[in-house]
Protein backbone atom coordinates (compact mmCIF):
# COMPACT_ATOMS: atom_id res chain seq x y z
CA UNK A 1 0.00 0.00 0.00
CA UNK A 2 1.47 3.39 -0.92
CA UNK A 3 2.52 5.53 2.05
CA UNK A 4 0.21 8.26 3.23
CA UNK A 5 1.32 11.73 2.11
CA UNK A 6 3.02 13.75 4.85
CA UNK A 7 0.92 16.34 6.66
CA UNK A 8 1.94 19.69 5.15
CA UNK A 9 3.09 22.53 7.33
CA UNK A 10 1.25 25.82 7.52
CA UNK A 11 3.98 27.64 5.58
CA UNK A 12 3.86 25.03 2.82
CA UNK A 13 0.09 25.40 2.54
CA UNK A 14 0.44 29.16 2.23
CA UNK A 15 3.05 28.87 -0.53
CA UNK A 16 1.14 26.25 -2.50
CA UNK A 17 -2.16 28.07 -2.13
CA UNK A 18 -0.54 31.32 -3.27
CA UNK A 19 1.03 29.64 -6.31
CA UNK A 20 -2.26 28.05 -7.37
CA UNK A 21 -4.31 31.21 -7.05
CA UNK A 22 -1.71 33.30 -8.83
CA UNK A 23 -1.99 30.96 -11.81
CA UNK A 24 -5.79 30.89 -11.65
CA UNK A 25 -6.19 34.61 -11.02
CA UNK A 26 -8.41 33.68 -8.07
CA UNK A 27 -8.84 36.02 -5.12
CA UNK A 28 -11.64 34.41 -3.09
CA UNK A 29 -11.08 32.65 0.20
CA UNK A 30 -8.90 29.54 -0.08
CA UNK A 31 -10.95 27.88 2.67
CA UNK A 32 -14.19 27.98 0.69
CA UNK A 33 -15.69 24.59 -0.29
CA UNK A 34 -13.61 23.06 -3.05
CA UNK A 35 -11.02 25.82 -2.91
CA UNK A 36 -8.20 23.50 -1.87
CA UNK A 37 -8.91 20.83 -4.49
CA UNK A 38 -6.21 22.08 -6.93
CA UNK A 39 -3.56 21.64 -4.26
CA UNK A 40 -1.63 18.51 -3.42
CA UNK A 41 -3.73 15.56 -2.25
CA UNK A 42 -2.05 15.57 1.14
CA UNK A 43 -3.62 18.92 2.00
CA UNK A 44 -7.00 17.34 2.71
CA UNK A 45 -5.58 15.95 5.95
CA UNK A 46 -4.63 19.49 6.93
CA UNK A 47 -7.95 21.25 6.41
CA UNK A 48 -9.31 20.80 9.95
CA UNK A 49 -6.01 21.80 11.57
CA UNK A 50 -5.68 24.83 9.32
CA UNK A 51 -9.16 26.06 10.26
CA UNK A 52 -8.04 26.24 13.88
CA UNK A 53 -5.57 28.97 12.90
CA UNK A 54 -8.44 31.25 11.88
CA UNK A 55 -9.56 33.43 14.78
CA UNK A 56 -13.32 33.74 15.14
CA UNK A 57 -14.02 32.54 11.61
CA UNK A 58 -12.17 35.51 10.05
CA UNK A 59 -9.77 34.50 7.31
CA UNK A 60 -6.69 36.80 7.09
CA UNK A 61 -6.21 35.83 3.43
CA UNK A 62 -9.71 36.87 2.30
CA UNK A 63 -10.65 40.18 0.67
CA UNK A 64 -8.48 39.75 -2.38
CA UNK A 65 -5.51 38.44 -0.43
CA UNK A 66 -5.26 41.51 1.83
CA UNK A 67 -4.74 40.81 5.54
CA UNK A 68 -5.46 43.03 8.49
CA UNK A 69 -2.68 44.22 10.75
CA UNK A 70 -2.92 42.34 14.05
CA UNK A 71 -2.86 44.30 17.30
CA UNK A 72 -0.77 42.94 20.16
CA UNK A 73 -0.16 44.13 23.71
CA UNK A 74 3.39 44.36 25.09
CA UNK A 75 3.86 45.48 28.70
CA UNK A 76 0.55 47.30 28.70
CA UNK A 77 1.06 49.08 25.37
CA UNK A 78 -0.91 48.24 22.24
CA UNK A 79 0.99 47.93 18.96
CA UNK A 80 -0.05 47.30 15.37
CA UNK A 81 2.36 44.89 13.69
CA UNK A 82 2.74 43.24 10.32
CA UNK A 83 0.96 39.93 9.92
CA UNK A 84 2.98 36.80 9.24
CA UNK A 85 5.86 37.87 11.48
CA UNK A 86 7.06 36.34 14.71
CA UNK A 87 7.22 38.30 17.94
CA UNK A 88 10.98 38.91 17.75
CA UNK A 89 10.69 40.45 14.28
CA UNK A 90 7.76 42.55 15.46
CA UNK A 91 9.71 43.83 18.48
CA UNK A 92 12.74 44.72 16.37
CA UNK A 93 10.56 46.58 13.87
CA UNK A 94 8.97 48.51 16.75
CA UNK A 95 12.34 49.45 18.24
CA UNK A 96 11.85 47.34 21.38
CA UNK A 97 14.94 45.77 22.94
CA UNK A 98 14.67 41.98 22.88
CA UNK A 99 17.99 40.09 22.86
CA UNK A 100 18.58 37.22 20.43
CA UNK A 101 21.40 35.12 19.00
CA UNK A 102 20.24 32.30 16.72
CA UNK A 103 17.69 34.28 14.67
CA UNK A 104 18.92 35.78 11.41
CA UNK A 105 16.74 37.65 8.89
CA UNK A 106 18.00 35.51 6.01
CA UNK A 107 17.76 32.17 7.81
CA UNK A 108 14.81 32.49 10.15
CA UNK A 109 14.43 30.97 13.60
CA UNK A 110 15.23 27.67 15.28
CA UNK A 111 14.88 28.64 18.96
CA UNK A 112 18.33 27.31 19.85
CA UNK A 113 19.69 30.10 22.03
CA UNK A 114 16.55 30.65 24.20
CA UNK A 115 17.59 34.28 24.55
CA UNK A 116 14.48 36.00 23.18
CA UNK A 117 12.28 34.65 25.98
CA UNK A 118 9.11 36.57 26.81
CA UNK A 119 6.05 35.87 28.92
CA UNK A 120 2.80 35.26 27.05
CA UNK A 121 -0.58 35.54 28.79
CA UNK A 122 -3.74 33.73 27.69
CA UNK A 123 -5.98 36.71 28.41
CA UNK A 124 -6.22 39.85 30.53
CA UNK A 125 -7.14 37.80 33.63
CA UNK A 126 -4.10 35.53 33.38
CA UNK A 127 -1.60 36.55 36.08
CA UNK A 128 1.01 33.80 35.67
CA UNK A 129 1.63 33.49 31.96
CA UNK A 130 4.13 31.15 30.37
CA UNK A 131 7.59 31.66 28.96
CA UNK A 132 7.80 31.38 25.17
CA UNK A 133 10.52 32.15 22.65
CA UNK A 134 9.86 35.33 20.69
CA UNK A 135 11.42 33.99 17.49
CA UNK A 136 9.13 30.94 17.54
CA UNK A 137 5.90 32.73 18.46
CA UNK A 138 3.78 34.14 15.61
CA UNK A 139 1.95 37.37 16.29
CA UNK A 140 -1.82 37.00 16.51
CA UNK A 141 -4.47 39.61 17.04
CA UNK A 142 -5.08 40.29 20.73
CA UNK A 143 -1.99 38.46 22.01
CA UNK A 144 -0.56 39.72 25.31
CA UNK A 145 3.17 39.63 26.07
CA UNK A 146 5.60 40.92 28.67
CA UNK A 147 9.22 41.76 27.86
CA UNK A 148 10.17 43.81 30.90
CA UNK A 149 8.63 41.61 33.60
CA UNK A 150 10.84 40.03 36.26
CA UNK A 151 10.01 36.53 35.05
CA UNK A 152 11.16 37.20 31.47
CA UNK A 153 14.21 39.25 32.45
CA UNK A 154 15.33 36.69 35.02
CA UNK A 155 15.09 33.91 32.45
CA UNK A 156 17.12 35.86 29.88
CA UNK A 157 19.79 36.71 32.47
CA UNK A 158 20.13 33.05 33.41
CA UNK A 159 20.57 32.11 29.75
CA UNK A 160 23.36 34.66 29.25
CA UNK A 161 25.01 33.52 32.48
CA UNK A 162 25.01 29.92 31.25
CA UNK A 163 26.46 31.00 27.90
CA UNK A 164 29.27 32.82 29.67
CA UNK A 165 30.28 29.83 31.83
CA UNK A 166 32.85 28.63 29.30
CA UNK A 167 33.31 31.85 27.36
CA UNK A 168 36.82 33.32 27.68
CA UNK A 169 37.25 36.85 28.96
CA UNK A 170 39.43 37.90 26.02
CA UNK A 171 37.38 40.82 24.70
CA UNK A 172 40.40 43.20 24.70
CA UNK A 173 42.25 40.93 22.25
CA UNK A 174 39.28 39.47 20.36
CA UNK A 175 38.98 40.61 16.75
CA UNK A 176 35.22 40.95 17.22
CA UNK A 177 35.60 43.46 20.06
CA UNK A 178 33.54 46.58 19.54
CA UNK A 179 31.08 44.95 17.14
CA UNK A 180 30.36 41.73 19.03
CA UNK A 181 26.71 40.77 19.21
CA UNK A 182 27.36 38.79 22.39
CA UNK A 183 28.78 41.89 24.06
CA UNK A 184 25.72 43.91 23.12
CA UNK A 185 23.23 41.30 24.29
CA UNK A 186 25.11 40.68 27.56
CA UNK A 187 25.00 44.37 28.38
CA UNK A 188 21.33 44.52 27.37
CA UNK A 189 20.26 41.83 29.86
CA UNK A 190 22.42 43.29 32.64
CA UNK A 191 24.77 40.35 33.26
CA UNK A 192 27.98 41.53 34.95
CA UNK A 193 29.51 39.07 37.43
CA UNK A 194 30.46 35.44 36.95
CA UNK A 195 29.41 33.25 39.88
CA UNK A 196 30.83 30.02 38.51
CA UNK A 197 34.39 29.34 39.68
CA UNK A 198 34.92 25.93 38.11
CA UNK A 199 37.15 24.98 35.21
CA UNK A 200 36.00 25.97 31.73
CA UNK A 201 35.68 23.65 28.78
CA UNK A 202 38.34 24.36 26.17
CA UNK A 203 38.60 23.32 22.54
CA UNK A 204 41.38 22.96 20.02
CA UNK A 205 41.10 25.43 17.16
CA UNK A 206 41.37 24.38 13.52
CA UNK A 207 43.18 25.77 10.52
CA UNK A 208 40.44 26.76 8.07
CA UNK A 209 42.59 28.45 5.45
CA UNK A 210 44.39 31.76 4.97
CA UNK A 211 41.24 33.89 5.14
CA UNK A 212 39.27 32.79 8.22
CA UNK A 213 40.51 32.40 11.79
CA UNK A 214 38.90 29.81 14.08
CA UNK A 215 38.53 30.32 17.86
CA UNK A 216 36.11 27.66 19.08
CA UNK A 217 36.32 28.60 22.76
CA UNK A 218 34.14 31.66 22.08
CA UNK A 219 31.22 29.64 20.70
CA UNK A 220 27.75 30.03 22.25
CA UNK A 221 26.12 27.22 20.21
CA UNK A 222 23.68 29.36 18.23
CA UNK A 223 24.08 27.17 15.10
CA UNK A 224 24.19 30.20 12.81
CA UNK A 225 27.41 29.00 11.16
CA UNK A 226 26.19 25.55 10.12
CA UNK A 227 22.73 26.82 9.19
CA UNK A 228 24.32 29.32 6.84
CA UNK A 229 27.18 27.18 5.55
CA UNK A 230 25.28 23.94 4.99
CA UNK A 231 21.64 24.93 4.59
CA UNK A 232 21.95 28.33 2.90
CA UNK A 233 25.27 28.21 1.02
CA UNK A 234 25.24 24.48 0.28
CA UNK A 235 28.65 23.71 1.81
CA UNK A 236 29.41 20.22 3.08
CA UNK A 237 32.74 20.48 4.90
CA UNK A 238 31.61 22.34 8.05
CA UNK A 239 29.36 20.67 10.59
CA UNK A 240 28.27 20.49 14.22
CA UNK A 241 30.19 17.68 15.90
CA UNK A 242 29.76 15.97 19.31
CA UNK A 243 26.86 16.88 21.61
CA UNK A 244 25.71 18.47 24.85
CA UNK A 245 28.40 20.58 26.49
CA UNK A 246 31.03 19.48 23.97
CA UNK A 247 29.44 20.62 20.70
CA UNK A 248 32.14 21.56 18.20
CA UNK A 249 31.65 23.53 15.00
CA UNK A 250 34.36 22.76 12.48
CA UNK A 251 35.64 20.31 9.90
CA UNK A 252 36.26 16.60 10.36
CA UNK A 253 39.86 17.37 9.42
CA UNK A 254 41.72 20.64 9.28
CA UNK A 255 41.81 22.30 5.89
CA UNK A 256 40.66 25.18 3.76
CA UNK A 257 36.90 25.73 3.69
CA UNK A 258 35.69 24.76 0.22
CA UNK A 259 32.70 27.07 -0.17
CA UNK A 260 33.03 30.19 -2.31
CA UNK A 261 30.94 31.99 0.32
CA UNK A 262 32.74 30.91 3.49
CA UNK A 263 33.76 34.49 4.28
CA UNK A 264 30.21 35.31 5.33
CA UNK A 265 30.84 33.26 8.47
CA UNK A 266 32.75 36.30 9.74
CA UNK A 267 29.57 38.38 9.77
CA UNK A 268 27.07 35.60 10.47
CA UNK A 269 28.78 34.51 13.70
CA UNK A 270 27.54 36.66 16.63
CA UNK A 271 30.80 36.17 18.54
CA UNK A 272 34.46 35.84 17.59
CA UNK A 273 34.56 32.17 16.56
CA UNK A 274 35.10 33.02 12.88
CA UNK A 275 37.08 36.19 12.24
CA UNK A 276 38.87 37.82 9.33
CA UNK A 277 42.41 36.45 9.31
CA UNK A 278 43.64 39.23 7.03
CA UNK A 279 43.38 41.59 10.02
CA UNK A 280 45.76 39.57 12.20
CA UNK A 281 48.94 41.49 11.34
CA UNK A 282 47.41 44.96 11.00
CA UNK A 283 44.39 44.77 13.25
CA UNK A 284 42.15 47.81 13.56
CA UNK A 285 39.15 48.28 15.80
CA UNK A 286 35.84 49.13 14.19
CA UNK A 287 35.69 52.61 15.70
CA UNK A 288 39.07 53.47 14.17
CA UNK A 289 37.96 52.65 10.63
CA UNK A 290 36.81 55.22 8.12
CA UNK A 291 34.02 53.50 6.17
CA UNK A 292 31.98 54.62 3.20
CA UNK A 293 29.39 52.87 0.99
CA UNK A 294 30.80 51.35 -2.18
CA UNK A 295 30.09 48.87 -4.97
CA UNK A 296 32.05 45.68 -5.61
CA UNK A 297 33.64 45.60 -9.07
CA UNK A 298 34.47 41.88 -9.02
CA UNK A 299 31.61 41.02 -11.38
CA UNK A 300 28.57 42.56 -13.04
CA UNK A 301 26.21 42.00 -10.09
CA UNK A 302 27.39 45.13 -8.30
CA UNK A 303 27.08 43.96 -4.70
CA UNK A 304 26.85 46.72 -2.13
CA UNK A 305 29.88 46.82 0.16
CA UNK A 306 31.21 48.78 3.10
CA UNK A 307 35.02 49.03 2.87
CA UNK A 308 36.93 50.21 5.92
CA UNK A 309 40.15 52.26 5.68
CA UNK A 310 42.79 53.47 8.12
CA UNK A 311 46.10 55.26 7.51
CA UNK A 312 45.41 55.26 3.78
CA UNK A 313 45.12 51.46 3.51
CA UNK A 314 42.11 49.24 3.00
CA UNK A 315 41.63 47.06 6.07
CA UNK A 316 38.51 45.07 5.30
CA UNK A 317 35.34 44.85 3.21
CA UNK A 318 31.97 44.09 4.80
CA UNK A 319 28.60 43.49 3.27
CA UNK A 320 26.18 46.40 2.94
CA UNK A 321 22.57 45.25 2.86
CA UNK A 322 20.60 45.81 -0.32
CA UNK A 323 17.51 43.64 -0.72
CA UNK A 324 17.45 43.98 -4.52
CA UNK A 325 21.12 43.17 -5.15
CA UNK A 326 23.09 41.13 -2.62
CA UNK A 327 20.95 40.93 0.50
CA UNK A 328 23.01 40.00 3.55
CA UNK A 329 25.88 38.15 1.87
CA UNK A 330 28.95 38.57 -0.35
CA UNK A 331 31.12 36.10 -2.19
CA UNK A 332 34.70 35.55 -1.01
CA UNK A 333 36.07 37.29 -4.09
CA UNK A 334 34.24 40.46 -3.20
CA UNK A 335 35.14 40.23 0.50
CA UNK A 336 38.80 39.25 0.30
CA UNK A 337 39.75 40.10 -3.29
CA UNK A 338 40.40 43.82 -2.89
CA UNK A 339 43.80 43.56 -1.23
CA UNK A 340 45.56 44.61 -4.43
CA UNK A 341 44.70 48.23 -3.67
CA UNK A 342 47.31 48.14 -0.89
CA UNK A 343 50.13 47.08 -3.25
CA UNK A 344 53.32 49.12 -3.03
CA UNK A 345 53.44 49.14 -6.85
CA UNK A 346 50.12 50.92 -7.09
CA UNK A 347 50.19 54.65 -7.79
CA UNK A 348 49.03 56.51 -4.71
CA UNK A 349 49.18 60.04 -6.14
CA UNK A 350 48.98 61.68 -9.60
CA UNK A 351 52.18 62.68 -11.34
CA UNK A 352 53.81 63.55 -14.65
CA UNK A 353 56.63 61.55 -16.20
CA UNK A 354 59.33 63.86 -17.57
CA UNK A 355 61.53 63.24 -20.61
CA UNK A 356 64.48 62.32 -18.41
CA UNK A 357 62.41 59.67 -16.59
CA UNK A 358 61.63 61.67 -13.47
CA UNK A 359 58.15 61.29 -12.02
CA UNK A 360 57.00 64.63 -10.64
CA UNK A 361 54.06 64.62 -8.24
CA UNK A 362 51.06 66.80 -9.00
CA UNK A 363 48.01 67.71 -7.00
CA UNK A 364 44.63 66.64 -8.36
CA UNK A 365 43.81 70.04 -9.85
CA UNK A 366 47.12 70.20 -11.73
CA UNK A 367 46.68 66.61 -12.90
CA UNK A 368 43.24 67.33 -14.36
CA UNK A 369 44.54 70.41 -16.15
CA UNK A 370 47.41 68.40 -17.63
CA UNK A 371 45.01 65.65 -18.75
CA UNK A 372 42.77 68.19 -20.46
CA UNK A 373 45.76 69.68 -22.27
CA UNK A 374 46.97 66.27 -23.49
CA UNK A 375 43.49 65.13 -24.55
CA UNK A 376 42.89 68.34 -26.50
CA UNK A 377 45.91 67.51 -28.67
CA UNK A 378 44.08 64.49 -30.10
CA UNK A 379 47.07 62.22 -29.47
CA UNK A 380 45.65 60.44 -26.40
CA UNK A 381 43.40 57.39 -26.51
CA UNK A 382 41.41 56.02 -23.61
CA UNK A 383 40.83 52.31 -22.97
CA UNK A 384 38.00 51.54 -20.58
CA UNK A 385 37.50 48.41 -18.52
CA UNK A 386 34.49 46.19 -17.77
CA UNK A 387 35.87 45.96 -14.23
CA UNK A 388 35.53 49.71 -13.72
CA UNK A 389 32.26 51.41 -12.92
CA UNK A 390 30.00 52.81 -15.64
CA UNK A 391 30.65 56.30 -14.30
CA UNK A 392 34.43 55.91 -14.52
CA UNK A 393 34.24 54.65 -18.11
CA UNK A 394 31.91 57.48 -19.07
CA UNK A 395 34.20 60.13 -17.60
CA UNK A 396 37.16 58.67 -19.48
CA UNK A 397 35.16 58.70 -22.72
CA UNK A 398 34.08 62.27 -22.04
CA UNK A 399 37.68 63.33 -21.51
CA UNK A 400 39.30 61.72 -24.56
CA UNK A 401 36.31 61.97 -26.91
CA UNK A 402 34.13 59.33 -28.55
CA UNK A 403 36.54 58.71 -31.46
CA UNK A 404 39.50 58.08 -29.14
CA UNK A 405 37.75 55.80 -26.65
CA UNK A 406 37.70 51.99 -26.64
CA UNK A 407 35.47 50.12 -24.17
CA UNK A 408 38.13 47.56 -23.26
CA UNK A 409 36.56 44.41 -24.69
CA UNK A 410 36.38 42.76 -28.10
CA UNK A 411 33.95 43.46 -30.89
CA UNK A 412 32.17 40.15 -30.24
CA UNK A 413 31.57 41.11 -26.63
CA UNK A 414 30.39 44.53 -27.77
CA UNK A 415 27.82 42.87 -30.05
CA UNK A 416 26.60 40.69 -27.19
CA UNK A 417 26.28 43.67 -24.87
CA UNK A 418 24.37 45.63 -27.52
CA UNK A 419 22.03 42.69 -28.14
CA UNK A 420 21.40 42.20 -24.43
CA UNK A 421 20.71 45.90 -23.97
CA UNK A 422 18.28 45.89 -26.90
CA UNK A 423 16.43 42.87 -25.48
CA UNK A 424 16.18 44.51 -22.09
CA UNK A 425 14.83 47.79 -23.45
CA UNK A 426 12.63 46.62 -26.32
CA UNK A 427 11.28 43.25 -25.24
CA UNK A 428 9.47 41.67 -22.32
CA UNK A 429 12.72 40.35 -20.91
CA UNK A 430 13.46 41.54 -17.37
CA UNK A 431 16.54 41.58 -15.17
CA UNK A 432 15.45 39.75 -12.01
CA UNK A 433 16.71 40.79 -8.60
CA UNK A 434 18.02 38.38 -5.98
CA UNK A 435 14.62 37.87 -4.34
CA UNK A 436 13.02 37.02 -7.69
CA UNK A 437 15.71 34.46 -8.49
CA UNK A 438 15.40 32.84 -5.07
CA UNK A 439 11.64 32.39 -5.49
CA UNK A 440 11.70 31.29 -9.15
CA UNK A 441 9.88 28.08 -10.11
CA UNK A 442 12.27 27.24 -12.96
CA UNK A 443 15.63 28.63 -14.07
CA UNK A 444 17.38 28.05 -17.40
CA UNK A 445 21.14 28.69 -17.65
CA UNK A 446 22.75 28.64 -21.10
CA UNK A 447 26.47 27.91 -21.32
CA UNK A 448 27.59 29.89 -18.29
CA UNK A 449 29.59 29.10 -15.17
CA UNK A 450 27.62 31.30 -12.78
CA UNK A 451 29.87 30.60 -9.81
CA UNK A 452 32.83 32.19 -11.59
CA UNK A 453 31.11 34.96 -13.53
CA UNK A 454 28.50 36.06 -10.96
CA UNK A 455 28.98 34.26 -7.63
CA UNK A 456 26.20 36.09 -5.80
CA UNK A 457 23.72 34.93 -8.44
CA UNK A 458 24.94 31.36 -7.89
CA UNK A 459 24.09 31.69 -4.20
CA UNK A 460 20.61 32.90 -5.13
CA UNK A 461 20.19 29.90 -7.46
CA UNK A 462 20.97 27.61 -4.54
CA UNK A 463 18.13 29.23 -2.61
CA UNK A 464 15.72 28.63 -5.47
CA UNK A 465 16.54 24.91 -5.50
CA UNK A 466 16.45 24.77 -1.71
CA UNK A 467 13.10 26.56 -1.43
CA UNK A 468 11.46 24.30 -4.01
CA UNK A 469 12.73 21.25 -2.12
CA UNK A 470 10.85 22.41 0.97
CA UNK A 471 7.52 22.70 -0.84
Q: Positions of the model-derived regions?
A:
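Catalytic alpha/large subunits of respiratory electron-transfer oxidoreductases
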Residues: 164, 168, 215, 222, ...
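Fe-S ferredoxin-like electron-transfer domains
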Residues: 44-46, 52-65, 114-297, 301-305, ...
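A basic, amphipathic helix-loop patch mediating RNA/tRNA/ribosome contacts
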Residues: 87-121
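A short, aliphatic-rich alpha-helical micro-motif
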Residues: 14, 110, 437-438
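Short, small-residue-biased leader/transition segments that mark boundaries at the very start
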Residues: 4-21
